[in-house]
């Protein structure tokens, strides 16, 4: 794609926030270019679940007409605690629904409602439905030749490359394929379609979740004539008279300068692979413990580093500096390693998580972020930050465990490559994993005592709508709790990972990058995970990165357009 050396706005990054900012500004009449470090576009968004938490959106209002501004504000006050930002939260509540309507009306973006509860639905202002929406599945042939530039989904959460919608409605058919004719036929159709796509295009073309979100946004940008320059990393902000006026970038091996008449918006995905910064920010890394992130390895903090280099402040202050995700390391062979995020198995009845001492430490059916935070705290003073998810053979066959798929898929290779641990008895499993055998046997005995009645008095599994949402509704009386039966027993070792950083560049509500003295750096903006999260290091619901990121991308795009037209932010 051809490009010039001067635009109104330069956006650095092709995730949901960057493309939202670019599209909004373009629709307002600005001349925009988007730069992408990788040879493919989509960023972390393309690997994600594609869910947006946008309270009071028009889809959610149909599901839950009783939701209100007051309820959302109360919920956010509770969830963010001392980090509650009145102006930012008010703007998010006001502009989020407008953002959804704008993108559905003006672009190729389409959303569908989900059944996700808030992650803490019983908290003040929490809701059991209506706040999370999902990108509608998309046929990437609509991108034309640019379909080859769409970042593929995370390999570990596909089945032979086939994607699943991150709403529970899609996945339930795959878990029920051997029990229900309807589900069997659904799965068979999906598999046949996918095999045809692989034969013709060497990848899935019917994409869902974050891949659909990234694809729809990219199509919208490309349809508007916005150049998306891949393999074009930005390395430096060009400053003149204290104002950001462009970036230095490398393209085709040449160092070049692209000028911005109005501004530069950083949307580089935060710093989950900036080793120096995360070692300072992540508590378990300070202890020298393992961390694996499924986010793109190219997210090395380019935006935060460029902002700092010109006087911007990176706000490292949240107790939880990132969105935690318990993960396992997956060996694919030939030296290829993947990261599997534990999104589903922890909720299932008959699966429990224990530390090296053999003891449970939290409600396994809480959100990934809450389980991660509990794991970091529980492993304080231990030699590693890790837990083992374990179950019996029946449960493994029914639900799978981590990257191990349910029956009838074979498990032998996972045992041979060390991903899956096996033991005929609990003591054998403890010996194989290094777990304390007495602690493990005691834990399972105590757990089973109550599990036969569907109860978990120690941690309350199944006590919230969110606990139950990804569990097994056919397991009575508690969809999250079942006893661990006879051996053999199986376990996977889970370490800490993340879905992206919460700490980030300090900005105004409109996204203007701030100096340490609180003044604005003219012409420099930050959106998405480059910008400090409004959630204060908490994770209140499904899509609390994409929802605010797209909303504030929209806000920043409008703000820059307003500046160009002599309008003030407060007027629109």
Residue ranges and their predicted role:
Residues 37-227, 350-353, 360, 394-397, ...:
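Conserved N-terminal/central alpha/beta ligand/cofactor-binding core
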Residues 129, 134-185, 304-306, 310-435:
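An anion/pyrophosphate-binding glycine-rich loop and adjacent beta-alpha core
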Residues 306-313, 441, 548-569:
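Internal hydrophobic alpha-helix adjacent to the cofactor/substrate pocket in enzyme cavities
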Residues 236, 243, 439-534, 538:
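A glycine-rich dinucleotide-binding beta-alpha-beta segment and adjacent secondary-structure elements
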Residues 204-211, 223, 251-330, 546, ...:
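Glycine-rich loop(s) and the adjacent beta-strand/alpha-helix scaffold that form part
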Residues 381-488, 556-559, 563:
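Helix-rich C-terminal "cap"/substrate-channel and partner-interaction subdomain
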Residues 1-9, 27, 211, 215, ...:
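Extreme N-terminal leader/targeting segments of oxidoreductases
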Residues 9-34:
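N-terminal Rossmann-like FAD-binding beta1-loop-alpha1 element of flavoenzymes
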